[in-house]
Each structure stands twice: as C-alpha cells, then as structure tokens.
C-alpha cells in the first residue's frame, strides 16, 4: 500500500495517525508511507522522530471573528492545495487519510479532486471544522464515537474507534516501584494532560493531606511547566511511598494498566486509551476547547456508566476526594464501571481503520 497521511497541530490528530501507520507497517512491511504536516505543528518533530517520511505545507486556521487574516488564510489554503496536488502527483498514493487539523483539509481535498480514494478519521464526538468540510468529498468517514455519526453523511460512516487504543492495548505494562509506590496497592492517576491543567493541579495540591489518609496511593502528574511553581513550597519527601508528584511521565501508556482510576481531561485520545484498557475514570472536561467537545466526549462514557464527570467550574478539593472515595472505596462499583469502560473500548481500532483504507484503495 502507498499511503499518504495528513494530520497536525495537536497530539490528538497526530498520535492516532502514527498508530494507524504502525498497523499498516505490521500488515504490509513493504508499504510506502508519506506524512504531510506543517513545519510549526507538533508533527514536525514527532513524525520524523518516528522514522516516517515527512513533508510540510504552510497553512493556518481561520479566525472565528471577521479578520483581514482570514483573506490571507484563504490564499494560503489555495496555495496549499496546489502544493498538495503536486505531492499527490509525485507520491502516487493508493489512498489518502486525513486525521484532522487544517493541513489535512488541503491534502485530502486535493487528493479527492484528483480522483484518489480518500478517508478521514474523526476522533471526537463533535465534528471538527476541517472534517465537516471534507466529508462531502471523501469515500469513507471513520469515527471514534457513535455520537459523531449523525453529523456526517450516513452511508459513508464507519465506527472504527481511535487507533491509539490498539497501540496502548499492546504495550507491556511497567511497575510502580519506579515511582516509589507499591504495585499491590490500588492506585489513582491524576493527570491534566501533557501540559498540565492549572485548576486540576491546584485542587489536587489542596487535597494532598486527605489523599495521604486514604488506603489507596496516588500518582499526580503536574505537567512540566507547572511543576516547579506548584512544588516550591512542598516537602516532596513527606509524601514518598504514598503520593508520587511528578512533572511528566515519558512512558505514560506503560503505567496506565496499573491504575484503578484515572482523573483527567476528556480528550479523544485519552478516552480511547482508558476504554481500551477498561479503566474507570473521573473526567474533568477542558472548558477551553472548541464547541465544548470534551464534555460531549465525556458524556459518551458517563451515559454508559463508564465514568464520572466533574465540571471544572464545580471542581473543589471536596468534590474531588468525595468522587475518588466513591470509586476507590467500593471495589464492586469500580469493577462494574471498569467492565462498562471495557465494553466501549476498541482495541482493534487500528485494524478497523486499516480495513477501511484497504476497502477504498486503488
């Protein structure tokens, strides 16, 4: 298979693409793959570091208010389509996959206009602007949440799940002794995303003394940019053996399966990971994302009794510890929630998406 992939800007668009590429290489070792992204997005480092051929297109998003910048954006989009056509013509892909972000709009649109089979993957419950635009032109639309189906042309939609779920399900877990914790003690992970989340961090700091009294242990990941400020007045040694306070965990997927409960945001990739592993969660959707899509992602789990939700505006030390205790001190309830999360998981998501690509490829 000659596969062209495009997706960029955030990890939520990039990591599912990389997981799919891994599946393609496993299934077809002689496959040829080209990833098209931007020079400024996260993909410009992550993709080449993964050993994947990478080319760039200069593009930017539209401003939500009336702006002269939008005229520049239209010009950039049109020139990006021209550049994308040239890349498609040179690479001659059997199929093109877009995983979101403005760059995928130019690439997938160009390929569609050239008669090349195209597929888009939507990670969220609420459809992104780029994928909504592309849905008119592509052959198939792969979705991660059933809630997204009604926002697309019905005949094109396939529920595949998020390919990241497959990757995480296959990772060999590592122990908790590396953090000074006991592998046999039930553990909670509190994690506000790779950059951390200020409100989650502050409330967790305010809850440390209560967490010390609980029969479970905690891993609290602050995000690198917040760590020094949050811990400058804290005696970290005081919490050793009970609460591990860390700036970042490089091998995060390796420790997830050791968690009894995860507290964090409701990004699409995170939810794909925790449902794939069948882990109960307390979700605190980010109020800063487009169309409040994290709340809608979270409700997909809450409505299936696979997660609890706390709005950031309602997040207090009391709300956090009470919700944690509800899950962590009631193993029967936690087990039911874990089963429900597992039922929602799509550990074959990468294979499912690969099958969709094969079904439309030349």
Curated annotation (Swiss-Prot):
Class in the EC hierarchy, top level: transferase
Main subcellular location: membrane
Domain of life: Bacteria
GO cellular component: plasma membrane
Entry-linked Pfam families: Glyco_tran_28_C, Glyco_transf_28
Subcellular location: Cell membrane
GO molecular function: undecaprenyldiphospho-muramoylpentapeptide beta-N-acetylglucosaminyltransferase activity
InterPro entries documented for this protein: GlcNAc_MurG (IPR006009), Glyco_trans_28_C (IPR007235), GlycoTrans_28_N (IPR004276)
Catalytic reactions on record: Mur2Ac(oyl-L-Ala-gamma-D-Glu-L-Lys-D-Ala-D-Ala)-di-trans,octa-cis-undecaprenyl diphosphate + UDP-N-acetyl-alpha-D-glucosamine = beta-D-GlcNAc-(1->4)-Mur2Ac(oyl-L-Ala-gamma-D-Glu-L-Lys-D-Ala-D-Ala)-di-trans,octa-cis-undecaprenyl diphosphate + UDP + H(+)
Keywords assigned: Cell cycle, Cell division, Cell membrane, Cell shape, Cell wall biogenesis/degradation, Glycosyltransferase, Membrane, Peptidoglycan synthesis, Transferase
CDD domains: GT28_MurG
Binding sites annotated in the UniProt record for UDP-N-acetyl-alpha-D-glucosamine: 10-12, 124, 194, 249, 294
GO terms (BP aspect): carbohydrate metabolic process; cell division; cell wall organization; lipid glycosylation; peptidoglycan biosynthetic process; regulation of cell shape
Involved pathway(s): Cell wall biogenesis; peptidoglycan biosynthesis
Stored NCBIfam families: murG (TIGR01133)
Protein family per UniProt: Belongs to the glycosyltransferase 28 family. MurG subfamily.
Job description of the protein: Cell wall formation. Catalyzes the transfer of a GlcNAc subunit on undecaprenyl-pyrophosphoryl-MurNAc-pentapeptide (lipid intermediate I) to form undecaprenyl-pyrophosphoryl-MurNAc-(pentapeptide)GlcNAc (lipid intermediate II).
Protein name per the record: UDP-N-acetylglucosamine--N-acetylmuramyl-(pentapeptide) pyrophosphoryl-undecaprenol N-acetylglucosamine transferase
Gene behind this protein: murG
């Amino acid at each position: 298979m000659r596969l062209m992939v495009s997706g960029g800007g955030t990890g939520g668009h990039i990591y599912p693409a990389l997981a799919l590429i891994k599946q393609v290489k496993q299934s077809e070792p002689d496959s040829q793959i080209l990833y098209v992204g931007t020079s400024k997005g996260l993909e410009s480092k992550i993709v080449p570091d993964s050993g994947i051929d990478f080319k760039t297109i200069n593009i930017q998003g539209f401003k939500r208010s009336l702006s002269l910048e939008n005229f520049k954006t239209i010009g950039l989009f049109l020139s990006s389509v021209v550049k994308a056509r040239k890349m498609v013509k040179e690479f001659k892909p059997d199929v093109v996959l877009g995983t979101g972000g403005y760059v995928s709009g130019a690439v997938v649109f160009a390929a569609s206009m050239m008669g090349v089979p195209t597929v888009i993957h939507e990670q969220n419950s609420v459809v992104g602007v780029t994928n909504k635009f592309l849905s008119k032109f592509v052959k198939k639309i792969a979705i991660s949440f059933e809630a997204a189906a009604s926002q697309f042309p019905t005949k094109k939609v396939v529920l595949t799940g998020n390919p990241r779920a497959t990757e995480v399900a296959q990772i060999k877990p590592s122990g908790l002794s590396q953090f000074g914790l006991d592998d046999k003690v039930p553990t909670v992970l509190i994690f506000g995303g790779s950059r951390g989340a200020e409100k989650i961090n502050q409330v967790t700091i305010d809850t440390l003394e209560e967490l010390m009294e609980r029969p479970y242990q905690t891993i609290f990941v602050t995000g690198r940019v917040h760590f020094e400020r949050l811990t400058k007045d804290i005696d970290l040694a005081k919490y050793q053996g009970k609460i591990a306070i860390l700036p970042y965990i490089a091998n995060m997927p390796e420790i997830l399966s050791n968690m009894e409960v995860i507290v964090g945001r409701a990004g699409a990739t995170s939810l794909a990971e925790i449902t794939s592993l069948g882990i109960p969660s307390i979700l605190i959707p980010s109020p800063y994302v487009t169309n409040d899509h994290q709340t809608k992602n979270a409700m997909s789990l809450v409505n299936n009794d696979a997660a609890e939700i706390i709005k950031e505006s309602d997040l207090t030390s009391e709300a956090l510890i009470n919700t944690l205790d509800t899950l962590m001190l009631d193993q029967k309830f936690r087990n039911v929630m874990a089963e429900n999360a597992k039922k929602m998981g799509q550990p074959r998501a990468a294979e499912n998406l690969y099958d969709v690509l094969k079904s439309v490829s030349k």
